[in-house]
């Protein structure tokens, strides 16, 4: 009996053949040369019926292929949300799947996992809120579920630094409403205003008390980092001073 046919049946969603092969004694966790199981392929296709059949037959929802991917991770990457409830009920690595969903902008999957009680930790020193700081919908969702808006990544950046760097005014406003320190400095001594290069972001940060002339570890102000002419103009109009940094270099003011 060639149990590799179980893999082919899962790839094609052939439920009758799957059932027969399982009844004949094939392991539901047979692997191909890539370390992938029938459940992996069913999850990748988003085949709810086949996923349910394999899990009931004892398939391991936590089996990883040679790239380290589990069925729930590949389902999330493939945006097959329908199978996530089945997989998340018995799978470990759901937090990893949550990061994958957020990274791919899969709002529905993120909402589902948060609603089931999955709470993100930090991945490589980066919180989930740092990761999605350019996506207002996900920022709002994570804040609603109590994710820390003041978390710092490995470089000392907060989500507000990241939202400013993304020039996402909606994200910046959502975070500012949570009351973070608008002048918090990262490991380079930069405040969120140092990263903002969008007029709307700059206006929001200043409205909440950002220091126009804060200096970083190199003695540079936000004006030194302004690459957009309108952003530079907004800073100057509100009182930014073109002072030299610690190397004696003045800001280069871009034109509009």
Curated annotation (Swiss-Prot):
Disulfide-bonded cysteines: none
Entry keywords, A to Z: ANK repeat, Repeat
Cross-referenced SUPFAM superfamilies: Ankyrin repeat (SSF48403)
InterPro entries: Ank_repeat_dom-contain_49 (IPR051637), Ankyrin_rpt (IPR002110), Ankyrin_rpt-contain_sf (IPR036770)
ANK repeats: 1-30, 34-63, 67-92, 93-122, 124-151, 155-184, 188-214, 218-245
Protein name, entry field: Putative ankyrin repeat protein PAE1861
Protein source organism: Pyrobaculum aerophilum (strain ATCC 51768 / DSM 7523 / JCM 9630 / CIP 104966 / NBRC 100827 / IM2)
